[in-house]
Amino acid sequence: MLTFAGMAINQRCRPRSGRRPPLAWARPRIGLQPLGSGGGARYDTAMVQLLYDAGALLGESPRWSAPEQRLYWVDIEGRIIHRTDPVTGADEVMTLDEQVGCVAPRAGGGLVVAMEDSCALIDNWGAAPRPFGPAVLAEKPEQRFNDGCVDGAGRLWVGSLTSDKAHPTATLYRLDPDGSLSEVFGGLTTSNGAAFSPDGRRFYHADTPTHTIRAFDVDPASGTLGAGRIFHQFPLGNGRPDGAAVDAEGCYWSALWDGWRVVRLSPAGELIQTVELPVQRPTMIAFGGADMQTAFVTSAGKNLSDEERKAQPHAGGVFAFRVGVAGLVQADFAG
């Protein structure tokens, strides 16, 4: 066991290929909706595989490491960082003493992590986290860090969420490689869906309870945002936008909490593809594999009734399916 500033880390290797089901676990329908008017929707059959039956309380933040060919992801409420081999199903875990909202590889090796009230660096797998940047949420016990992504300049954009839903005081921040932390904008409840276009000139963001994804022009060099605009508005009662990723064609993929699916939106914000999943609460999508054409989706298994759990026995698992367009290779954190 490693200890650091009151934080304990248990490192163990758990090859879990024995819990991996047959590859043809599920064959949900993928609905492809035409961009223009005229013509009917066509449907293809895709295979969604249960990659890892983790039973996570709140699986989140999948990030592919190309050098390692491993998927990093977290169970926020389980206080666990996972490193999963999608080929063998083997899974390694680091167990922390506080929640971890998101994780990303670093350019020099190791990880950057957003903990409950501050960010930290992990120099190598199993090493103790060391603080990096100010503990900006230390005096805000109703908040914790949540979703994040790294831009092309190696900066981590990370937002918070608040448990006080009546007062939207959560904030999106930008962590620079030198450890400085800047406030980007506030007035949020649950910061989610952070992603960048292929050229780095458009930033996407969702405040989950609003059912809205917004797009912002961004200066890739300075990280300065322009005014935001509505990119896509989801109807009430059919899922809310959670974590996201962008593919090589500039399409934005969003996991819909309470929506049983992930969707693909064109650069114009039009719904062009829906992938149905066997879980109610998919949380985030990432692309990986040797050709970047495997989509990985984390999910949540918390707060389900017995009846709901019976209908989705693999809630909290990590799922995978193949895509026709490769995902973007995300930059690593430069700090």
Predicted regions mapped to residue ranges:
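Hydrophobic alpha-helical segments and helix pairs
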Residues: 128-184
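Blade-level signature of beta-propeller repeat domains, shared across WD40, Kelch, NHL, RCC1
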Residues: 288-335
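Beta-rich, blade/repeat-based domains predominating
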Residues: 54-68, 97-112, 139-155, 184-202, ...
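Conserved beta-strand positions in repeat-built beta-propeller and related beta-rich domains
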Residues: 65-66, 71-76, 112-117, 156-166, ...
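A short beta-strand motif characteristic of beta-propeller blades
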Residues: 48-53, 89-95, 130-138, 180-186, ...
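A short loop-to-beta-strand structural motif that recurs across blades of beta-propeller domains
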Residues: 80-82, 118, 170-173, 212-214, ...
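Short loop/turn segments immediately following beta-strands, especially the blade-tip
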Residues: 125, 216-223, 323-327
